[in-house]
Curated annotation (Swiss-Prot):
Residues 56-59 are extracellular. May interact with target proteins during translocation into the lumen of the endoplasmic reticulum. May protect unfolded target proteins against degradation and facilitate correct glycosylation. One of its GO terms (cellular component) is endoplasmic reticulum. It is found in: Membrane; Endoplasmic reticulum membrane. This is Probable stress-associated endoplasmic reticulum protein. Belongs to the RAMP4 family. Residues 1-34 are cytoplasmic. Pfam families: RAMP4. PANTHER family: GEO09675P1, STRESS ASSOCIATED ENDOPLASMIC RETICULUM PROTEIN SERP1/RAMP4. Keywords: Endoplasmic reticulum, Membrane, Protein transport, Translocation, Transmembrane, Transmembrane helix, Transport. The chain crosses the membrane at residues 35-55.
Length: 59
């Protein structure tokens, strides 16, 4: 019994996939900070605001 052409192609594709298992492609390292400017502004607002409140309460 001979295999049909499509069956051979599927088998070959499967074999190539087997050899690639477990190999992760290296990810590009992104430079810079990945944070929304609004979120960064909110964090700075909270930190600076809480610092000012603590200074004013201490006096």
């Amino acid at each position: 019994m001979s295999q049909s052409r499509t069956l051979r192609q599927k088998s070959q594709k499967y074999q190539e996939n087997i050899e690639k298992r477990g190999v992760a492609s290296p990810k590009k390292k992104e430079d810079g900070l990945n944070i929304n400017p609004y979120v960064l502004g909110f964090i700075i607002f909270v930190v600076v605001g809480s610092t000012l409140l603590q200074i004013l309460k201490g006096q």
